[in-house]
């Protein structure tokens, strides 16, 4: 009987991270059925280790090799669990590509995820980072996350509150060696409720001649904007936005706006703070379009670090550190990376 996983020793991870940097893993396990996870974790190759769980590789930077075995979940089933006239609860397994899930939901007549179209990566990775774009975060729609708890040796179901979602944050991000996300349950809407707070989204829809958009229209606009602004990882290595927008006290945001005319400021995650544009600060430090060897910053978007071909992860990390130092020097604000960094510290 064939095993529900595939095993590769001394595996290259170049094609498993969207930066396209070379890194190796002592073992790579590809798992087709999350039900076999407990048996897999009991294998001698994984005994006493904390395997690195790898989704689409779109939210990490290998600054060195993976010291522990790597586990890739390939389970990708999706189904509607329950529904009524206003909502539907959907269960998607961790290996389902995120954009494919968004498009599947639209085909089912379900709304809510359209602003998150074309985000790379897998569904299992989405709640870890609490992915967000164009005014929407996935945590708003999560009903529960199913995850293997390595500390307890059991499969757990964490409701939205237990996930502790924040800006690009969750309980899973703070305990990367504890949880392996196996599936996500989402509560989606039956009727369109367009979220058009992001100015560029409304402008894109207007340019498309759409005054009363449905969810598919919004997704089409988001896809057009992303394709125009963000380089395709299949063409040039990148992980999308590399830096988070810093959240600062209201008083500091107002002072920065007085000192730096044009600095975009957005609503924060609480009444007493604001989110300021990392892209604007990076661009005004002169980094947009910068290149040092094969490590660089996209000419189309200052938040995106790119691998022009043969940059190492460490070269990209060193560039990111230089960018952060220049922003701190000029604006007095610390910017932090979105991707998880493997093989080095930030």
Ranges and model annotations:
Residues 2-152:
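Anion-binding (especially nucleotide phosphate/pyrophosphate-binding) glycine-rich loop
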Residues 323:
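Phosphate/pyrophosphate-binding loops and the adjoining catalytic core of nucleotide-dependent enzymes
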Residues 36, 97, 274, 319-320:
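Residue-level preference for nonpolar/small residues embedded in alpha-helices
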Residues 8-9, 15-21, 60, 155-314, ...:
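Phosphate/pyrophosphate- and phosphate-bearing ligand-binding catalytic cores of soluble enzymes
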